[in-house]
Swiss-Prot record:
SUPFAM superfamilies: LeuD/IlvD-like (SSF52016). GO terms for molecular function: 3-isopropylmalate dehydratase activity. Belongs to the LeuD family. LeuD type 1 subfamily. It comes from Pelagibacter ubique (strain HTCC1062). Heterodimer of LeuC and LeuD. The lineage of its organism: Bacteria, Pseudomonadati, Pseudomonadota, Alphaproteobacteria, Candidatus Pelagibacterales. InterPro entries: 3-IsopropMal_deHydase_ssu (IPR004431), Aconitase/3IPM_dehydase_swvl (IPR015928), AconitaseA/IPMdHydase_ssu_swvl (IPR000573), IPMI_Swivel (IPR033940), LeuD (IPR050075). Its EC number is 4.2.1.33. Keywords: Amino-acid biosynthesis, Branched-chain amino acid biosynthesis, Leucine biosynthesis, Lyase. The gene is leuD. GO terms for cellular component: 3-isopropylmalate dehydratase complex. HAMAP family: LeuD_type1. This is 3-isopropylmalate dehydratase small subunit. The keyword Amino-acid biosynthesis applies.
Length: 203
C-alpha cells in the first residue's frame, strides 16, 4: 500500500447525498479480484450515457477535475452493500482523499485499508471547500498535521491515531500481519508442541 503523507490537488465536488457503493462501482464490475482497471468504471452510470459515451456535465469528465485526487462528496458517502471494489475504483481513478460530512462505517474502514484518507468535516466547511472546486483552485492535505490548507486558511480534522499511522507508513492488513511474523511463528510452534493433535502435518 502506498504511503499517504500530503496531497495537493484541485478538488472535485460531487454534492450528492447517500452515494452508495453500487453508484461508486456497479455490481457488473465486481467479478475481478484485481485492484487495477476499475477506475474507468467509477461512477459508471453517472459518467456514461446508454451508448457508453461520457456525459460532459459530470464533474469527473471535465478538465481539470478528471485529474482530481481529492473528492468532496455529499453526506453518508459509501453507504449500501459492502464491497472493497469501491475504494479500489476510487484509487485506480487517482482519488486518494475523500472529504464528506459522514460515511458508511464499512466503506470508511475500507478506505484506510487501501490507502485512501477519508476526512470528516461539518457541512459548513464542506461548502467552504467546494468553492475551490468551482474556481478550479488547489487545496492541500497534510495528514501529519491533520489539516487542510486552502488560500490563506486552514481547517483541522481528526483521525484515529492508529489509522493515521497506517496511512503514513503504508501499512495494510497484510503488512500489519507480517510485522508480527516472528510472534505468529512462535505461537504456532508452541501450539504444535502443546496440542499436536490439532495439526495434520504429514511432513
Amino acid at each position: 500500500m502506498q504511503k499517504f503523507n500530503s496531497l495537493t490537488s484541485i478538488p472535485a465536488y460531487l454534492p450528492i447525498v447517500n452515494i452508495d457503493t453500487d453508484m461508486i462501482i456497479p455490481k457488473q464490475f465486481l467479478k475481478t479480484i484485481k485492484r487495477t482497471g476499475l477506475g474507468k468504471n467509477l461512477f459508471f452510470e453517472m459518467r456514461y450515457d446508454d451508448n457508453g459515451n461520457e456525459i460532459k456535465d459530470f464533474i469527473l469528465n471535465q478538465k481539470p477535475h478528471n485529474q482530481s485526487k481529492i473528492l468532496i462528496a455529499g453526506k453518508n458517502f459509501g453507504c449500501g452493500s459492502s464491497r472493497e471494489h469501491a475504494p479500489w475504483a476510487l484509487l485506480d481513478f487517482g482519488i486518494t482523499c475523500v472529504i464528506s460530512s459522514s460515511y458508511a462505517d464499512i466503506f470508511y474502514s475500507n478506505c484506510f485499508k487501501n490507502g485512501i484518507l477519508p476526512i470528516t468535516l461539518p457541512e459548513e466547511k464542506i461548502k467552504e471547500l467546494s468553492e475551490y472546486s468551482k474556481r478550479k483552485e488547489e487545496i492541500s492535505i497534510d495528514l501529519n498535521e491533520e489539516k487542510i490548507i486552502f488560500g490563506n486558511s486552514e481547517i483541522k480534522f481528526d483521525i484515529d491515531p492508529f489509522k493515521k499511522k497506517c496511512l503514513l507508513e503504508g501499512l495494510d492488513d497484510i503488512a500489519l500481519s507480517l510485522a508480527k511474523k516472528e510472534k505468529i511463528i512462535t505461537f504456532e510452534e508452541n501450539l504444535k508442541n502443546n496440542k499436536p493433535w490439532i495439526f495434520n502435518d504429514k511432513n
